[in-house]
A protein has these predicted regions:
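Generic alpha-helical propensity signal that fires on short helical segments
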Residues: 40, 48, 57, 112-116, ...
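Helical scaffold of the NTase/Pol beta-like nucleotidyltransferase catalytic core
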Residues: 3-5, 13-100
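Active-site nucleotide-donor binding segment shared across nucleotidyl transfer reactions
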Residues: 83-137, 143-144
Length: 144
């Protein structure tokens, strides 16, 4: 039997009640897929809200709790990064427009719970790109 890409992650997100019947091998695949997709903590949140955490094997629960701690760290780090971004944008009189993950966190959207991301997506008018790059450089960011 061929397992579709991210089958276990999709199952956990769409039908979380099904994961309680997973064996340890399936849990291992779910954890690997979820970590790669940055949604393991999100799955933990879903399992908690569905009152299914008590049915999760302790080996998997440790991984979920670790992912939740890391996601909380990412969200705290975002606050610090946003302060610098806001200073940069204020210095040139442009609004700071966030997209995707960071926007969900700032908006306190439920979608942000357990979400992990490695960058901050911004919307900048093309005409202002050079100006924004200079302001970000002054605040300590360097072009990658």
């Amino acid at each position: 039997m061929e397992i579709k890409k991210n089958y276990y992650v999709i199952t956990a997100l769409v039908n979380p009640e099904k994961v309680v019947d997973f064996n340890l091998f399936q849990w291992s695949l779910l954890i690997c897929q979820a970590r790669r997709a940055g949604v393991l903590a999100r799955i933990g949140y879903i399992l908690e809200t569905q009152q299914l955490l008590a049915k999760v094997p302790k080996e998997a629960l440790k991984q979920i709790k670790s992912a939740e701690i890391y996601a909380q760290h990412v969200h705290r780090s975002l606050d610090w990064e946003l302060q610098g971004l806001q200073r940069a944008f204020d210095s040139i009189g442009l609004p700071l427009v966030l997209l995707k993950g960071s926007l969900y966190v700032v908006a306190n959207n439920r979608t942000a719970i357990g979400r992990v991301f490695s960058d901050i997506d911004l919307l900048v008018p093309e005409i202002n790109l050079k100006q924004v790059e200079r302001a970000l450089n002054i605040e300590g960011w360097k072009a990658g």
